[in-house]
């Protein structure tokens, strides 16, 4: 039984797949988004104990997401190759949503850390803005409204760093590792479906090439068989005539590849003719039992 014969049509698995991509995964992603909001709130307010608990709860949601994505993988691997394009179209939206949610969660903390470092390193520069003509009024220096607003928003947006002596610092590292693993799982899942489709396309190309080769090979074998059959009586006559008698009889059949003979030149020729007819009948029987291979021209026309 071939690998594809063990798989099933998409319509048989579609209800289960739709349940995951329409209900299960979106529910997990919504729960993860709420964890992200709570984490941001507790970290901004420096409520480290609550933040630690939220990190743990978010980690459980991430693990549930990973488990559900693996279940979808198992279902997708059972789908027949004919339905892979439709399957890919079906799962792409939820895959992209999961990837974006994971990246957003990781990016929030990353940007906050980088911004805090930038504020620390550039503290003196921020206190002494560059001078321009438009910024000097009556000898007093003023920052532009846009720059002041930007600095204010940056300070509000950036989350405070978690103290290393807090449990929340360690729990964040664990959650971060889980999020990265989830992101990699989503990427691998996407590559799995794409690689299956590429494999099918490659197989189709090889099948087309093989069909051309088989078609040409069949023609060449037919020609060779005809030449071989035509040579059998002549070779039988020549060797049978040279040897003569019962030995010539056997030699005539040896050339044809079968032990039978009639002896002498004429008998050698006759032996070759008999074998020619026998092989001809075998070829006709074999040819009639084999299905005709469709030519590439017929395939293109159809």
From Swiss-Prot:
Membrane topology of the entry: Multi-pass membrane protein
Glycosyltransferase listed as a keyword: no
UniProt keyword annotations, A-Z: Acetylation, Autophagy, Coiled coil, Cytoplasm, Cytoplasmic vesicle, Endoplasmic reticulum, ER-Golgi transport, Host-virus interaction, Lysosome, Membrane, Mitochondrion, Phosphoprotein, Transmembrane, Transmembrane helix, Transport
One GO molecular-function entry: SNARE binding
Coiled coil: 53-123
Motif Endoplasmic reticulum retention signal mapped to chain: 299-302
Phosphotyrosine modification, residue list: 157
Segments in the Lumenal topological domain: 250-254
Cytoplasmic face residues: 2-228, 276-302
Record family assignment: Belongs to the syntaxin family.
Entry protein name: Syntaxin-17
Species the sequence originates in: Homo sapiens (Human)
Gene of this entry: STX17
